Amino acid sequence: MITFIICLVLLVVAYFTYGKYLEKVCKIDTKAEVPSSRLYDGVDYVPMPRWRTFLIQLLNIAGTGPIFGAILGACYGPVAFLWITLGGIFMGAMHDYLSGVILVRNDGLSITEIVARYLGKGAGAFMRIFSVALLLLVGVVFVVSPADILSTRFELIDKGWWLAIIIAYYFIATLLPVDKLIGKVYPLFGFALVAMALGLLGVLLFGDYTIPSMTLENLHINKENLPLVPTLFITIACGAISGFHATQSPLMARCVNNERECRFVFYGSMISESIIALIWAAVAMAFFHNDGGVSAALAGHTPAWAVNEISNTTLGVVGGILAILGVVAAPITSGDTAFRSARLIIADMLRLEQRTKWKRLVICAPLFAAGVALTFVNFDIVWRYFAWTNQALATVVLWCIVVYLHKERHNYWVAIVPAVFMTYICASFVFVSTQFVGMGAVPMAYVWGGVATIVITLLMAYKILRSRKALQ
């Protein structure tokens, strides 16, 4: 229990300390004109209250990530607490906050355009294709997974109808101005997501459950089957650091009222997500403690099953409702904003303004046609690569932040250390995982990961040294 409490306190304190320090690093200007007012179009560039942009950002970046990922991460033992806490504070929240500030200072453009601006046209072109494909994949999977769950719970309605209903909702949400549907409905889901986490926190603190504290013996369980490096850092993405967040942040970067709000909206939402992930990891460890641990309990089951079991048992009838929220509403709200982000990336790439409905339709129609077609594809193999691509995207954004801070003569060490670390995680995963080279957790795999990291770091150092002169 004490490890969990310490990590929880550290996350809260970090918002008021490290988050405040990052504000000084960025030299926040409260008088600077922001995109929501300067580029107001009534569709995507719309100023909204700070509390609303925070809740929408939280729901956009969360989805099922801090729930399912944390439950799977709990298989590693209490070491998951460390990664969620330290990763959330120094990597994830920093990544979300600094990329959010950069987006606000660059007209709220899509992250792909920011990468092109700071890492070069080649990197930008790759990121455009990579990001649209990733967002399309996320959107489609978040159509299929809730449809599966709903068709199981409500057998009178066929899965095909659920697919049609969800896709129709996605299309409308992607097409409408951000304040008409997302701005009104999502804060309610955001409140519910927070309420679910707080309810489980109450159960942990005051219920008859024991959260394992971290010791040398249980620091990392299942060492033989679950190598800590790099798989833990790939498994727990949302809650620690996630590149998907950078694709979602432009939505709210176009809605903040001033630069000061960025810490609350971007750093605060990521810290909140880390707290949610920490709670779910702790709940999973405590709930399945007498069943042989999380790994044994999940054998033959999915994280969605675990959410349902935990929620119904610990929170009763209310828990059943919240379980539906966690495994249905959360992915749906991330899925539609994934499609919306894809629309914005394509619009920014084509320099196609989105004020009029027909120009939004020009992008939405083929985008959703591709999405509908992909719902009939088996994603079992492709989806295995999502976790790695998500962290690879985060790594690219971290290097982009480094270039920006170096160019602006700010303290770039806050980003370069996480960038090098995540480069090593992604590189070593390529050599260790059977999804790629498949060498396994042998010393040589880690050596090759280190060599790849050194090469990439040297290339980025060359880019950084050139960037200041090129961008002046």
Predicted segments with their positions:
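Membrane-interface "cap" regions at the ends of multi-pass membrane proteins
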Residues: 10-67, 231, 258-261
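Hydrophobic, membrane-embedded alpha-helices of multi-pass small-molecule transporters
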Residues: 49-65, 203-209, 218-280, 325-334
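Loop-to-transmembrane helix boundary motifs in multi-pass membrane proteins
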Residues: 121-125, 132, 160-164, 268-277, ...
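Extracellular/periplasmic helix-exit of transmembrane alpha-helices
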Residues: 205-214, 267-309
